[in-house]
């Protein structure tokens, strides 16, 4: 119920808690969406440049969870957890993302996939619980740059998938 109320809020109500990142990816929404659905895909592109991802468990369904570790280029490991709150194939994915299932600082993200000719415009809209948490994510964890790099990695991976599908 709380997330529905937040989402229904006006843009100005969340502007100081929100990060929005978008990119046009040269592939159809169905293929871009597919890259989120399985470990074999996610482990190839998830995270900023220089990071790798190890999945402990993944259940891609509404209410399902993804428990994983992001390995930073400096050797630091970051435990991560996502619960999928809404999935509309090739259109929308909503999630709660934190360090663990009980993380009081978990944040909400919504990804939308919009057809743009033969390409897809993906938008990642993240809302933090407080403006201070958004600021910390931007300054300490470089959330904007990391998000842009993650979508760049997704674009490169999906281009490889599209090329392989074209050959097959």
Positions of PLM-derived features:
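A conserved amphipathic terminal alpha-helix motif
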Residues: 1-4, 128-168
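Short beta-edge strand/loop motif at the mouth of beta-sheet-based domains
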Residues: 20-21, 40-77, 165-168
